């Protein structure tokens, strides 16, 4: 676990937030779910991921450093909810009704599927594409899929196919 760039105070705050939400969930659910493993190895634009089988939460250290408070209040409970849902209900839809219930009724956090953090510092090279209404930035992976003819992307607003600029 490489965490040398992440101040110990932030790591402690994350752990404190995780333990508080876990205790709250255990109390409300009448269970004694164990503390998940926590690592700071998530990369890219994902804020975090929950690994069910290894019962682990992986957090993005760059986004955590830039958005500490919101991260602890939103991302940590979001990923914890995935693990608790898996323990409580088994394998169900990732952001389904069980997850929403766990977030809102048990953990007391608004159930949002995605974060709104600024991604400039974690975004790699992008490629400009256009549609009728705006310019889009496609990741290297998506751009390569277009080039190889494996994928076509459309604008969510106007529905037009994206074309390389």
From Swiss-Prot:
Keyword Ubl conjugation: no
SprT-like domain sequence ranges: 20-163
Stored SMART domains: SprT (SM00731)
Cofactor annotation remark: Binds 1 zinc ion.
Record carries keyword Zinc-finger: no
Record's GO cellular component terms: cytoplasm
Residues forming the catalytic site: 79
Main localization of the protein described in the UniProt heading: cytoplasm
Pfam families in UniProt: SprT-like, Zn_ribbon_SprT
Cofactor(s), names only, from the UniProt record: Zn(2+)
Compartmental location: Cytoplasm
Membership in a protein family: Belongs to the SprT family.
Protein name as catalogued: Protein SprT
Species: Shigella sonnei (strain Ss046)
The organism's taxonomic lineage, starting at the top: Bacteria, Pseudomonadati, Pseudomonadota, Gammaproteobacteria, Enterobacterales
């Amino acid at each position: 676990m490489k965490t040398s760039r992440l101040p110990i105070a932030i790591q402690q705050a994350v752990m404190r937030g995780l333990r508080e939400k876990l205790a709250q969930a255990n109390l409300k659910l009448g269970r004694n779910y164990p503390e998940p493993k926590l690592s700071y190895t998530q990369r890219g634009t994902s804020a975090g991921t929950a690994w069910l089988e290894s019962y682990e939460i992986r957090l993005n250290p760059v986004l955590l450093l830039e958005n500490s408070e919101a991260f602890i209040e939103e991302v940590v409970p979001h990923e914890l909810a995935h693990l608790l849902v898996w323990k409580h209900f088994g394998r169900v839809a990732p952001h389904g009704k069980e997850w929403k219930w766990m977030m809102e009724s048990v953990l007391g956090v608004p159930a949002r599927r995605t974060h709104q953090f600024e991604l400039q510092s974690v975004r790699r090279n992008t490629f400009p594409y256009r549609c009728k209404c705006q310019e889009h930035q496609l990741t290297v992976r998506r751009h390569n899929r277009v080039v190889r003819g494996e994928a076509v992307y459309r604008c969510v607003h106007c529905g037009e196919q994206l074309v390389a600029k």
